[in-house]
């Protein structure tokens, strides 16, 4: 009988203090959850700012790549007709009337400049 009374008294004390600790635990859990949400929010904000920075870097790289991939204007090679209706001659060539093709087609041709 004495042991039953001791166990009942321990049960009552444990229940009383257990409820008090449970309330404290609930408050601590609320604080932990709020802190986790704050950390998640801050992490999300940091990720968003990092994403914006990466998008800015990517857009500048794409602009540079687009500039690099742009083709130069086409030019005419050696012995190709040139003039106002045709593309310009490539570097190292000049648009001149020649005796060979010019008299037949009545247009100047891209030729290497004479050294004389």
Curated annotation (Swiss-Prot):
Natural source organism: Trittame loki
Record GO cellular component, one term: extracellular region
Note on domains (UniProt): The presence of a 'disulfide through disulfide knot' structurally defines this protein as a knottin.
Propeptide residues according to the Swiss-Prot or TrEMBL record: 21-74
Intracellular or extracellular location(s): Secreted
Tissue expression from the record: Expressed by the venom gland.
Main location: secreted
A Pfam match: Toxin_22
InterPro entries: Toxin_22 (IPR012627)
S-S bridge residues: 75-90, 82-95, 89-110
Family from the record: Belongs to the neurotoxin 14 (magi-1) family. 06 (ICK-Trit) subfamily.
Example of a GO MF term: toxin activity
UniProtKB keywords: Cleavage on pair of basic residues, Disulfide bond, Ion channel impairing toxin, Knottin, Secreted, Signal, Toxin
Record's signal peptide: 1-20
The protein's name in its UniProt record: U16-barytoxin-Tl1d
Purpose of the protein: Ion channel inhibitor.
Superkingdom, taxonomy of origin: Eukaryota
Record's keyword annotation contains Nucleotide-binding: no
């Amino acid at each position: 009988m004495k042991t039953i009374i001791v166990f009942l008294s321990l049960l009552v004390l444990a229940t009383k203090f257990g409820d008090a600790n449970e309330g404290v635990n609930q408050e601590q859990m609320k604080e932990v959850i709020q802190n986790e949400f704050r950390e998640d929010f801050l992490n999300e904000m940091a990720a968003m700012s990092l994403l914006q920075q990466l998008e800015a870097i990517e857009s500048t790289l794409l602009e540079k790549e687009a500039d690099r991939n742009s083709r130069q204007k086409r030019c005419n090679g050696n012995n190709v007709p040139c003039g106002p209706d045709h593309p310009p001659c490539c570097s190292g060539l000049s648009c001149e009337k020649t005796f060979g093709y010019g008299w037949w087609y009545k247009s100047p041709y891209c030729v290497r400049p004479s050294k004389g």
